[in-house]
Amino acid sequence: MSSAAEQAMPIEFTEQAASKVGKLIAEEENPNLKLRVYVTGGGCSGFQYGFTFDEKKNPGDMEIEKNGVTLLVDPMSLQYLMGGVVSYEEGLQGSRFFVDNPNATTTCGCGSSFSV
């Protein structure tokens, strides 16, 4: 069950993603790290998702906290990610963070690029 604050967030950060971020931060032994999701031009569909760890929040960044870890999204990327879900999956082809984006009109086969 989600709290009212979580329901009001324009991007969802799943339990699986937050748990994996927490494990990765523990491995790095740097509690200041936050997961940043961003959108850049490129990929086979026009835009692509990126994930990186960042120690600082930039002016205008949105912060989404879950289970003691923080997801950061810059204002430009946020406009493309509204209503999206940042998750994490492990499978036969490896593990990855990914975005389920309702704004994407097309996505590439690997799911890392999209168009709007």
UniProtKB/Swiss-Prot annotation:
Keyword Metal-binding: yes
InterPro entries registered for this protein in UniProt: FeS_biogenesis, FeS_cluster_insertion, FeS_cluster_insertion_CS, FeS_cluster_insertion_RrpA, HesB-like_dom_sf
Pfam families for the chain: Fe-S_biosyn (PF01521)
Cofactor(s) named in the record: iron-sulfur cluster
Gene Ontology MF annotations: 2 iron, 2 sulfur cluster binding; 4 iron, 4 sulfur cluster binding; iron ion binding
Similarity field: Belongs to the HesB/IscA family.
Protein name: Iron-sulfur cluster insertion protein ErpA
UniProt source species: Idiomarina loihiensis (strain ATCC BAA-735 / DSM 15497 / L2-TR)
